[in-house]
């Protein structure tokens, strides 16, 4: 891993840490979050596995160690997010357990997910494919987003909603199938997005 990749990895870790700890950062905060916050610990190893793979070190000791820890934490916490998944900085896992995300999904920056969330692939029909999640999106407990749908920037998806159609920016969606019930978006749910980016 070269210096630019190490720097990019540090920025991802810092953004995730800042969001998980409500605006705190620094080495002692990072150590505390690693020990006490399962969502941050999981993302720490996912980011390391992804970056060491991207640097061409598929069979290096750091990559293999990161993959091993990532796999261990997948089972321990019930979070099935492959390290190959494209996830922007500031990813926040509010509660863990029963989280399943397809590896081809694209997730923007500052996205919140809750327990029981499924973001998956549709294998047939007009929405064959995987979702693209915009930045600043809140996904509530038990929500399902499936197929080639686009979730607009700043949207909020309610608990147990099933999203099978595109959502515009700042949409609030609820129900089965999900429908837009307001355009107030995720304001108040997605917080601490002002982390330093350099």
Each model region followed by its residue ranges:
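Left-handed beta-helix
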Residues: 77, 82-83, 88-89, 94-103, ...
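Broad hydrophobic/π-residue packing in well-ordered secondary structure
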Residues: 36, 43-53, 114-115, 138-140, ...
């Amino acid at each position: 891993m070269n210096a630019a990749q190490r720097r990019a990895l540090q920025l991802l870790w810092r953004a995730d840490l800042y969001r998980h700890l409500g605006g705190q950062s620094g080495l002692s905060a990072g150590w505390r979050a690693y020990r006490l916050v399962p969502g941050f610990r999981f993302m720490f190893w996912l980011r390391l596995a992804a970056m060491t793979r991207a640097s061409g070190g598929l069979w290096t000791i750091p990559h293999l160690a990161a993959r091993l820890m990532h796999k261990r934490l997948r089972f321990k916490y019930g979070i099935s997010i492959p390290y190959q998944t494209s996830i922007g900085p500031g990813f926040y896992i509010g509660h863990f357990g029963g989280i399943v995300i397809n590896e081809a999904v694209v997730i923007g920056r500052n996205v919140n997910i809750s327990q029981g969330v499924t973001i998956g692939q549709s294998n047939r029909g007009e929405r064959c494919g995987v979702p693209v999640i915009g930045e600043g999106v809140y996904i509530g407990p038990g929500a399902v987003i499936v197929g080639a749908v686009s979730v607009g920037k700043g949207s909020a998806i309610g608990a147990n909603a099933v999203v099978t159609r595109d959502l515009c920016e700042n949409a609030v969606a609820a129900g089965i199938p999900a429908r837009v019930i307001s355009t107030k978006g995720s304001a108040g749910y997605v917080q601490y997005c002002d982390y330093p980016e350099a």
